[in-house]
Amino acid sequence: MCQSDEMSEPTPTRLCVYCGSNSGTSPAFAAVAARLGTALANRGIGLVFGGGRVGLMGITADAAMQAGGEVIGVITERLVGAEVAHRELTRLEVVATMHDRKARLSELADGFVVMPGGFGTVDEFAEMLTWNQLGLLAKPVVLLDVDGFWEPMLTWMDKAVEFGFVRPAHRMLAQRALSVDEAIAMATSPVPDTPHKWLDRDATPARGVPEQL
């Protein structure tokens, strides 16, 4: 006799954490990164990240591993060659390009928490926000604002709304959290219900990785 779908084992929740490959100048960044990694593991939530052993990436991954959590890294061949890959993870996946890396991280994760970081972190944040805006993805994106790091970005987004470049409804896709607990709660909740740019409002957004932008 076949078991019903209700009896099948659910897919574990995983959150992707975007953050810097440096630790930054404020000790608060590293402290919050460690707290986030530990909190994810304690809640049984898997960590998906960029696969690096350095900076906030390494701190978050180490904390999650030490707390017994699942940690999956996705890194490019070039970065493996630069010897920055984290080798002590549950699983490390190596992909060809940065685009492949973003696509795979998106595929593995149920939501995104964005810690302080540099250009790469902003690129990842902006792409996931855009995929949600276009209706190609339906996964929450949360800025974990440590020491006011993301305040200039939040101000810019408000200006983009003011000057007509972003719809007010789409501005809601970028959520702000002031604590680790708040960030996890937001990232594991349904994405805000917004109309999808250029697409029919009744269209059902894809849950996986978009085939094209």
State the predicted function of each range.
Residues 2-108, 148-186, 191-213:
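A cross-family phosphate/adenosyl-ligand binding-site feature
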Residues 11, 135-137:
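Short loop/turn segments at connectors of secondary-structure elements within structured domains
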Residues 51, 75, 95-97, 115-117, ...:
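Short beta->alpha connector loops at strand-helix junctions that form conserved
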Residues 101-135, 142, 193-202:
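Active-site/ligand-binding-proximal alpha/beta "capping" segment
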Residues 118-120, 134, 147-149, 180-181:
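Short acidic/polar capping segments at secondary-structure boundaries
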